[in-house]
Swiss-Prot record:
Membrane-spanning parts: none
PANTHER family: ACIDIC LEUCINE-RICH NUCLEAR PHOSPHOPROTEIN 32, ACIDIC LEUCINE-RICH NUCLEAR PHOSPHOPROTEIN 32 FAMILY MEMBER A
Residue span, LRRCT domain: 123-161
Annotated region described as Necessary for tumor-suppressive function, given as residue ranges: 150-172
Chief location: nucleus
A Pfam family recorded for this sequence: LRR_9
Encoding gene per record: Anp32a
Sequence similarity: Belongs to the ANP32 family.
Tissues in which the protein is found: Widely distributed in the central nervous system, with an abundant expression in the cerebellum.
Phosphoserine modified-residue sites: S17, S158, S202
Biased composition (Acidic residues): 157-230
The protein, known as: Acidic leucine-rich nuclear phosphoprotein 32 family member A
PTM entry text: Phosphorylated on serine residues, at least in part by casein kinase 2/CK2. Some glutamate residues are glycylated by TTLL8. This modification occurs exclusively on glutamate residues and results in a glycine chain on the gamma-carboxyl group.
Organism the protein comes from: Rattus norvegicus
Ranges where the record places region Disordered: 150-247
Amino acid sequence: MEMDKRIYLELRNRTPSDVKELVLDNCRSIEGKIEGLTDEFEELEFLSTINVGLTSISNLPKLNKLKKLELSENRISGDLEVLAEKCPNLKHLNLSGNKIKDLSTIEPLKKLENLKSLDLFNCEVTNLNAYRENVFKLLPQVMYLDGYDRDNKEAPDSDVEGYVEDDDEEDEDEEEYDEYAQLVEDEEEEDEEEEGEEEDVSGEEEEDEEGYNDGEVDDEEDEEDAAEEEGSQKRKREPDDEGQEDD
């Protein structure tokens, strides 16, 4: 499904300003850019675009309230300065599985003063010498890199609470999405059943008309037979009458 169509479906008759979370994972980005997302989503706090074929985020709309952004498993190699401009309050950023090769690419993230957690799993930049040390030095506001702090201690539950809450809400969204999709499917099935019933009724009417016509034909044949029989009887009586007259 194309991204703009997926966004329309995810709205579920809501206005963009009513949406706080938007999951667009595994849909298609035709030109490698974010499509169908506008600055009307002013209340959006969580956006997930995992594996959608993004090569650029240059046309990301202004999302002042966005706190968590999932961009993993795409082909992004730059344009990260857009994030500081469009998402100034971003706290969690996942860029895992993208084409980020050097530290200069993530340097623009310095302007994200509230950035607390950054994930770069499976990016070439992680192969650089002293990768973790240099990233923490470059981005002093970041507390957790790939899930661990400067001392290689895993982020405690309190610091990943946002992730857990979001996952729960995502599950609820998926359930609502499934219910909505099922409702659409049920409506389509009902329409098909109604069409089938109309065809059956039409067929019965045709059969009734045929039966009625057959009945008319049978009645006509019976009348013809009766007329012939009556004529035959008259012919029999006529010779008898002639004989009586001769006598």
